[in-house]
């Protein structure tokens, strides 16, 4: 212990020197975060004294202090000046809120909407400055995309285009992959992937010229399997991988690419319960009889109820997502990935660090909708259906035909399990 003071003091000296330099540059956030960081370093110092040799302790303390102070640095922002940004999907939600904020900051905003007479478009026209331009565009129509690209090139000829925000997205059904029509997968890919790809490729000449930014709103459903979001998640997974490629390939041009992965937020689409009910009825009406008999209408009804319950817990304040998009556009060194909202850390921890079985239990529909093994295709869970024994079972009849299982499902529905907390914002 006698040799300890020099590494401990040396580490604190390095931390103090870094903090002093940041203070002189007005580049250090003061207050509770700084106090918490100092408390963390003090606790780490105490542990290192007892567990590590001096040189290792010096390295650990100095590295931790450097990282912590880097996180406490005030983010350096670029001036707005006359920068122009194009945002897709501004009828409502994140796109609408981002367009309003960027316009208020002084950006020249090109906002695309599905309908120029939609409530969101009329709101933007009423509350924003004359710099904001509303453009009608359907990402599934190449003619619309070509028209918007041409308008953007002409409109930004003098100022240049600084940023593209790929925000537009679509999810149609909440159901197992087998239940979703193939057309649903194609539609999600057209809007969420190919639409963003066409917009990005079409505007890259302008973005390379300005060394600008590409910001894409994706979803955690593209990073890991989420129950009943196969079509949407598949398209977002492809989109995230594409943006990862762009991020590497555009580095020589100075173009920075960021992905936004929001938690569950209460956008206009989420709040429209009538829309989800219509889509559920549409799915039930179009399902082949064989699938409807194998899965049962009760299963789809329960999934829809769980989904709506999870959306009722969505975060009402969209500002974390809007702030993340703004930071990705203006930060001198934007992050590659932003995770606005609460609860994401736990989900990613379960998926990436816990045993694979934990992720399957938490993300499987079977964890929220136990089914009688005589009627359903899930693994045999005799303790969920006490009236039946394990073993092979025919795929016949809906769950309502089994009174024991029906009562058990109703009992388990009241517990709600984890799945309502695992559904994420999907727009």
Curated annotation (Swiss-Prot):
Inhibited by glycyrrhetinic acid, carbenoloxone, 11-alpha-OH-progesterone and 11-beta-OH-progesterone. It is found in: Microsome; Endoplasmic reticulum. It catalyses: an 11beta-hydroxysteroid + NAD(+) = an 11-oxosteroid + NADH + H(+); corticosterone + NAD(+) = 11-dehydrocorticosterone + NADH + H(+); cortisol + NAD(+) = cortisone + NADH + H(+); 11beta,17beta-dihydroxyandrost-4-ene-3-one + NAD(+) = 17beta-hydroxyandrost-4-ene-3,11-dione + NADH + H(+). NAD(+) binds at residues 82-111. One of its GO terms (molecular function) is 11-beta-hydroxysteroid dehydrogenase (NAD+) activity. Disulfide bonds: none annotated. The active site is at 232 (proton acceptor). One of its GO terms (biological process) is glucocorticoid metabolic process. The keyword ATP-binding does not apply. Belongs to the short-chain dehydrogenases/reductases (SDR) family. Catalyzes the conversion of biologically active 11beta-hydroxyglucocorticoids (11beta-hydroxysteroid) such as cortisol, to inactive 11-ketoglucocorticoids (11-oxosteroid) such as cortisone, in the presence of NAD(+). Functions as a dehydrogenase (oxidase), thereby decreasing the concentration of active glucocorticoids, thus protecting the nonselective mineralocorticoid receptor from occupation by glucocorticoids. Plays an important role in maintaining glucocorticoids balance during preimplantation and protects the fetus from excessive maternal corticosterone exposure. Interacts with ligand-free cytoplasmic NR3C2. This is 11-beta-hydroxysteroid dehydrogenase type 2. It comes from Ovis aries (Sheep). The gene is HSD11B2.
């Amino acid at each position: 212990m006698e040799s300890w003071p020099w590494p401990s003091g040396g580490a604190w000296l390095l931390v103090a020197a870094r903090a002093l330099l940041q203070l002189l540059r007005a580049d250090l956030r003061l207050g509770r975060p700084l106090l918490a960081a100092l408390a963390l370093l003090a606790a780490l110092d105490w542990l290192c004294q007892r567990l590590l040799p001096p040189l290792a302790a010096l390295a650990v303390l100095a590295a931790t202090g450097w990282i912590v102070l880097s996180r406490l640095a005030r983010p350096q922002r670029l001036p707005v000046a006359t920068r122009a940004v194009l945002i897709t999907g501004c009828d409502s939600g994140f796109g609408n809120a981002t367009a309003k904020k960027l316009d208020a900051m002084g950006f020249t905003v090109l906002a695309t909407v599905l309908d120029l007479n939609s409530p969101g478009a009329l709101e933007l026209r009423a509350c924003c400055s004359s710099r904001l331009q509303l453009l009608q565009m359907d990402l599934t129509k190449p003619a619309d995309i070509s028209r918007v690209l041409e308008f953007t090139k002409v409109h930004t000829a003098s100022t240049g285009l600084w940023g593209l925000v790929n925000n537009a997205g679509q999810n149609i059904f909440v159901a197992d992959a087998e239940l979703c029509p193939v057309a649903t997968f194609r539609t999600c890919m057209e809007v969420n992937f190919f639409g963003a790809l066409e917009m990005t490729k079409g505007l890259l000449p302008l973005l390379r010229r300005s060394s600008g930014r590409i910001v894409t709103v994706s979803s955690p459903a593209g990073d890991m399997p989420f129950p009943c979001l196969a079509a949407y998640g598949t398209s977002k997974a492809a989109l995230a991988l594409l943006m990862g490629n762009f991020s590497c390939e555009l580095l020589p041009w100075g173009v920075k690419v960021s992905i936004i992965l929001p938690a569950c937020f209460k956008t206009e689409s989420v709040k429209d319960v009538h829309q989800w009910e219509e889509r559920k009825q549409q799915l039930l009406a179009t399902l082949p009889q064989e699938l409807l008999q194998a899965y049962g209408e009760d299963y789809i009804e329960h999934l829809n109820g769980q989904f709506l319950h999870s959306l009722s817990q969505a975060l009402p304040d969209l500002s974390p997502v809007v702030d993340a998009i703004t930071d990705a556009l203006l930060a001198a060194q934007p992050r590659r990935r932003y995770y606005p909202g609460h609860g994401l850390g736990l989900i990613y921890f379960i998926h990436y660090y816990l045993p694979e079985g934990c992720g399957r239990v938490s993300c499987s529909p079977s964890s929220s909708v136990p089914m009688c093994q005589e009627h359903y295709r899930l693994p045999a869970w005799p303790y969920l259906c006490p009236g039946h024994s394990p073993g092979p079972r025919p795929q016949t009849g809906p769950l309502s035909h089994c009174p024991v299982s029906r009562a058990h499902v109703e009992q388990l529905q009241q517990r709600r399990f984890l799945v309502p907390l695992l559904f994420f914002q999907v727009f």
